[in-house]
Amino acid sequence: MHFTQREQDKLMLVVANDLARRRQSRGLKLNYPEAVAIISYEMLEGARDGKSVAELMSYGRQILNKDDVMEGVSDMIPDLEIEATFPDGTKLITIHHPIV
């Protein structure tokens, strides 16, 4: 089986999301890469499920809050951009202040 670089990146994101969710379920606060992985994964899956860019931009701000992440992490992510594949093509999802 051969994966393209994009497919490998998506698989790594799935693994990072899984690890971050397991740590979160143990009561640990998320670090920067873990927070980005969770939000990015949810955006990709939402696009796959057929949600619109506008819906995902709104949903992206509801996934995590400051209590979920280590101190300072929310300030490190002023904007998050995720390129996702929608039924009508690839689009860029921009989430302003994803962790509030």
From Swiss-Prot:
<dbReference type="GO" id="GO:0016151">
    <property type="term" value="F:nickel cation binding"/>
</dbReference>
<dbReference type="GO" id="GO:0043419">
    <property type="term" value="P:urea catabolic process"/>
</dbReference>
<comment type="similarity">
    <text>Belongs to the urease gamma subunit family.</text>
</comment>
<keyword id="KW-0963">Cytoplasm</keyword>
<dbReference type="Pfam" id="PF00547">
    <property type="entry name" value="Urease_gamma"/>
</dbReference>
<protein>
    <recommendedName>
        <fullName>Urease subunit gamma</fullName>
        <ecNumber>3.5.1.5</ecNumber>
    </recommendedName>
</protein>
<comment type="subunit">
    <text>Heterotrimer of UreA (gamma), UreB (beta) and UreC (alpha) subunits. Three heterotrimers associate to form the active enzyme.</text>
</comment>
<dbReference type="InterPro" id="IPR050069">
    <property type="entry name" value="Urease_subunit"/>
</dbReference>
<dbReference type="InterPro" id="IPR002026">
    <property type="entry name" value="Urease_gamma/gamma-beta_su"/>
</dbReference>
<dbReference type="InterPro" id="IPR036463">
    <property type="entry name" value="Urease_gamma_sf"/>
</dbReference>
<dbReference type="GO" id="GO:0009039">
    <property type="term" value="F:urease activity"/>
</dbReference>
<keyword id="KW-0378">Hydrolase</keyword>
<dbReference type="GO" id="GO:0005737">
    <property type="term" value="C:cytoplasm"/>
</dbReference>
<dbReference type="InterPro" id="IPR012010">
    <property type="entry name" value="Urease_gamma"/>
</dbReference>
<comment type="pathway">
    <text>Nitrogen metabolism; urea degradation; CO(2) and NH(3) from urea (urease route): step 1/1.</text>
</comment>
